[in-house]
Each structure stands twice: as structure tokens, then as C-alpha cells.
Amino acid sequence: MNKNFKLIYTDPVLSVSTTKDYCELNCKHCNKKYLKSMYDIDDERLIETLKVKKKSTVLISGGSLKDGSVPFYKQMKNIEKIKNNGYLLNVHTGFLPTQHFHYLTFFDSISIDIVGDQIILREVYNLDVDISNLKDNILKIDEFLNNAKSKNPLLSDKIPKIVPHITIGILNGMDSYEEKAIDFISKLNIDKVVFNFLIPTKGTFYAKAKNVEIKRLSEIINYARSTLPGKKIYIGCMRPFGKSRVELDFACFDLSVDAIVNPSKDFVVQIKKLYQGDFSKDDNFIESKEGCCSLI
């Protein structure tokens, strides 16, 4: 077991779309389903909603354009309003045109989905973009942020870092070139990597996808640990529910990941029994946190 293991709960986080339910890609794992559950950034009652729901963090997301970008940069006025009201901001960027890089320092965290092969872009995201161009864009974002830290050493702690996300099994539950994605991440200046899992979702092309096998999960996590030494490994909030979630949580715990987001109740019950209801025992320590995992 990891001696600094965390359970992270996203109760204080509100997901906001900068494009309503509009998306030009209609990705096979989403098909706009997840956009419809997000709050609209143009909603005049958004700040009031954040206060009433006692949120502390906002995930700025939305649908993608044909170039793979999430056009949050068209909504900076509304984003500034949220920030000025004291909320932490995590942003999904996707591909980001260089003329908009300067907006990145406004955020507290930058989440970018990393894929390992052109096949994923074409088959899952319906994205007609060369993966080498996409990777080059991410490397340039990383370089921009590193330069911003160097130029502003007194403010370096306020300059965000990229938090790469990999969705295990995103290719209809099959092997999805996760190792190649991890290899690319090794080139970035990061503190952690977040692993999500494909959720077979009704109304999407992958509604009947099989869940990842534990053996395959072990291969990926162990490869990440050896390829990204010293970097934290988080299990993100995007995971199947029910029995599958419980099995994944226990498997990830056994693999000594650093954190699990929104753990299943059965998993927490068993862990509490193991540690006699006290989340500190011997040299091990299990810490419970609230917020967006990209910021913890």
C-alpha cells in the first residue's frame, strides 16, 4: 500500500460547459451525453448556483471543434467572473492554438487528455488531425508554462502545470495504446498522471464495451510507475459504476496508486475495517480530501 494514499471526493466541483451541448466531433465514448450534464457558462445564475451548492472549484470544459480544441478562450469574460468570485479553475483545453496560450496562466490547473496512437484520434474522437501535430502542441504548451515560471520566479507557484489524463480502454474497451501515451507523458514537466476508464454509456457507440481486465490494468499502472518515476498516479473520477467500480478500486489500491477519486462505498467500508475505522495506522496514512484531483 502507498504510505500517502488519498481518497478524493469531488463534491465541491462543478462542471461547466463553454459550448452548451455543442460539439463538432461526437466522440464515440461520449456522443454529447456528458456535455448535457454540465452547467452552461452563459447561465446568469451560475455564480448563485456555485454558492448555493457550496462549490469551491469549477471544471471549465465543453465540446470540441473540428481541430480538437475546446474553445474556452471565447468565454474568458465569463471565466474571469467565476475566478473573481474566488473559485479555483481547472480547464480542459484539448488542442490549443498558440495565440491563446497566454490565457493558460489564468487557470489553477490544466487537464489534457493524452492518446497514444493515430487510431484513437480517428476511431474514437472522429478527429482528422495528425497525432504528431497534437503532441507538438502539447509540448509547446508545456514549454510555455515552464518559461512563464522562469520569467516570474516569485509567482512560479501560481503558474499551473499540465495534468495529463489517460482513459484506459477508450477504444471500445480494448487495448488503447496506453503505454505509448505514457511514453509521451514522460517528456512533460508534470507532478502526476490521472488514469480514467471508459464508461460504457447508454446512447453512445461504446455502450456495450467490455470493462478493462485487471491484468491489463496492472500492466498499465506498473508501466507508468517504471516510466514516470517519482510522479504520482491518480485514479480519476471517470470509472464504471457498480460491481466493476468496486473491483477496480481494490485492484488499484493493491497496485499502490497514490489516490482514488470518488471511491466506491464498498471499497471504503472494507478499508475502514482494515484500518479499524482510523485512517492512520502504523507507518501508513490514508487521507481524505475534497476537490478536483488535478488540484490535489
Regions found by a protein language model. Give the residues of each.
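Active-site beta-loop-alpha junctions enriched in small/polar residues
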Residues: 33-35, 63-65, 94-96, 115-117, ...
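Auxiliary Fe-S-binding modules of radical SAM enzymes
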Residues: 1-6, 10, 47, 182-296
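P-loop/Walker A phosphate-binding loop and immediately adjacent motor/lid segment at beta-alpha junctions
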Residues: 123-162, 217-218, 225, 231-232, ...
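N-terminal [4Fe-4S]-dependent radical SAM core
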Residues: 1-39, 295-296
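Conserved strand-turn element in the central/C-terminal portion of the radical SAM core barrel
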Residues: 141-176, 195-210, 232-243
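Conserved Radical SAM active-site core
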Residues: 32-159, 174-187
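Glycine/Thr-rich phosphate-binding loops of Rossmann-like dinucleotide-binding domains
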Residues: 68-69, 120, 172, 203, ...
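Hydrophobic faces of well-ordered beta-strands that scaffold small-molecule active sites
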Residues: 14-16, 58, 89-91, 110-112, ...
